[in-house]
From Swiss-Prot:
Listed SMART domains: Pumilio (SM00025)
InterPro entries assigned to the protein according to its UniProt record, in alphabetical order: ARM-like, ARM-type_fold, PUM-HD, Pumilio_RNA-bd_rpt
GO MF, one annotated term: RNA binding
Full protein name: Putative pumilio homolog 22
Annotated ranges, domain PUM-HD: 5-348
Biological role stated in the UniProt entry: Sequence-specific RNA-binding protein that regulates translation and mRNA stability by binding the 3'-UTR of target mRNAs.
Originating species: Arabidopsis thaliana (Mouse-ear cress)
Length: 361
C-alpha cells in the first residue's frame, strides 16, 4: 500500500469489494497502522479505511490512534491522521453525553479545522477557558477525543503550552495515573525540553519526586511514570524520587511493582542516595522484618541486589549488613533466603582466609 501500484490496487479493492472483504481489509490495515501512517500513500488509504469502517472498527482505530498519539504527532502525516479522526462524526459523538465538554470540544474542532496552521490566539483563549475549571481540564485530557486534540495543540505556541502545563501541574497525580493523561504529561515535558526550557523539565521531574509515594500506589501508570523518570538517568530526578520514598523502601520491597521501583533506583548509579536510604532502613529494621525480607519472593531479590551493590560501592554498608545478618543465618537456611546465607558464608570464608594469609606473612 505504500508503493504506487499497491496504493492503486488498495484503492480499487476498497471501491469494489464486498462487505466481508472490506472488513478483512480494515483489520489488515489496523495491524499496520503505524507503518502506513508514516507514508503518503499509506496514510491516504488509512484515512479511507477508517472512514468506511463500521462503528466497532472505528472505535478500535480511535483507541489505537489515541494510544499512539504521541508518536503520530511527531510528523505531519501523523498529525493529519489525528485531525482526520477528530473530524469524523463518530469521534465527535464519543463526548456527546457531557454537554459542557462536548461544546468546548466543538469550539476546538472549529479552530483546528479552519486551516493547517490553527489560529494560535484563538487556541490560547480556548485553552485558557479550559483551565478555568480544573475538573473540566482533567475530563478533557482523559477522553480519547480530548487527548488527541491536546497532542496536536502542544508545541504550536509557548503561550498555549504554558496553559496546558499549568493544567498538568494542577492535577498532576490525576493526570499521570491516567492512561491518556500520562501521555499528555510526557508530551508536555518533551515540548518544553525541545524548546530548551529546562526549568519546566526540572519542575515536572521534581513533581514526580514530591508525589513519589502516592505514585507507587498505582501499579499501572504511576509505575510507568517512575520507570520513565528513572530511565532518564537524571541525577536530580533520581534524588527527588529517592527522597520522596524515604522510610518506605522495605515496605515497597515486598510488592511486585514496588520492588521493581526500588531495584531501578538502587541500580541507577547516577545517584547513591537510594542506596544510602535503603541501608538506613535495613540497619534500623528489626530481625523479624529482615528475615521476612530475605525469605520473600520480591524482597529477597532486593536484599541480594543491595549486598552486591554495597560490596562494590560502599564496603562499610556491606560490612554493617553482614554483621546484622550473621545472627540470622540459621533461620534462613533451607528457605528462599539460602542465597543470602551463601553470600554471607562466602564473605566470612574470605575474611578468614585473609586473616590466615596475613598471619602467615
Amino acid at each position: 500500500m505504500t508503493h504506487e501500484r499497491g496504493y492503486d490496487l488498495a484503492s480499487q479493492v476498497l471501491n469494489i469489494c464486498n462487505v466481508h472483504h472490506k472488513k478483512l481489509f480494515c483489520h489488515i490495515t489496523y495491524r499496520h497502522l503505524l507503518v502506513l501512517s508514516s507514508d503518503d500513500n499509506g496514510c491516504v488509504i488509512l484515512k479511507k479505511v477508517i472512514t468506511i469502517a463500521d462503528d466497532f472498527l472505528k472505535d478500535e482505530f480511535l483507541d489505537l490512534i489515541a494510544q499512539h498519539a504521541h508518536s503520530l504527532s511527531m510528523h505531519d502525516l501523523g498529525i493529519s491522521l489525528i485531525q482526520h479522526v477528530l473530524e469524523l462524526d463518530f469521534t465527535k459523538k464519543t463526548t456527546q453525553d457531557d454537554k459542557r465538554l462536548h461544546e468546548l470540544m466543538a469550539e476546538f474542532d472549529e479552530v483546528l479545522s479552519t486551516s493547517v496552521t490553527a489560529d494560535v490566539d484563538k487556541l490560547h483563549k480556548l485553552a485558557s477557558k479550559l483551565m478555568l475549571d480544573s475538573d473540566l481540564f482533567f475530563e478533557f485530557v482523559i477522553t480519547r477525543r480530548g487527548s488527541l486534540m491536546i497532542q496536536i495543540i502542544l508545541g504550536k505556541s509557548e503561550e498555549v503550552d504554558q496553559v496546558i502545563l499549568a493544567g498538568v501541574k494542577q492535577r498532576f497525580i490525576d493526570v499521570t495515573t491516567n492512561f491518556y493523561g500520562y501521555r499528555i504529561m510526557i508530551q508536555t515535558i518533551k515540548v518544553f525540553k525541545k524548546r530548551g526550557d529546562l526549568k519546566v523539565y526540572d519542575q515536572i521531574l521534581r513533581l514526580i519526586g514530591v508525589h513519589a509515594l502516592y505514585l507507587t500506589k498505582d501499579p499501572d501508570m504511576g509505575n510507568k511514570t517512575f520507570q520513565h523518570a528513572i530511565n532518564l538517568h537524571h541525577q536530580d530526578c533520581t534524588t527527588f524520587i529517592a527522597c520522596g520514598l524515604q522510610s518506605h523502601y522495605i515496605e515497597l520491597s515486598f510488592l511486585k511493582h514496588g520492588s521493581k521501583i526500588v531495584e531501578m533506583l538502587i541500580d541507577d548509579r547516577i545517584s547513591m542516595v537510594p542506596l544510602v536510604l535503603l541501608m538506613m532502613e535495613i540497619v534500623k529494621c528489626d530481625e523479624d522484618t529482615l528475615v521476612r525480607l530475605a525469605t520473600d519472593e520480591y524482597g529477597n531479590n532486593i536484599l541480594k541486589k543491595f549486598l552486591a551493590l554495597a560490596k562494590e560501592h560502599k564496603e562499610d554498608f556491606f560490612g554493617d549488613l553482614v554483621d546484622k545478618l550473621n545472627p540470622l543465618l540459621d533461620s534462613l537456611r533451607g528457605t528462599l533466603g539460602e542465597n543470602i546465607v551463601a553470600i554471607i558464608d562466602s564473605e566470612t570464608e574470605m575474611v578468614k582466609d585473609r586473616i590466615v594469609s596475613q598471619g602467615n606473612n
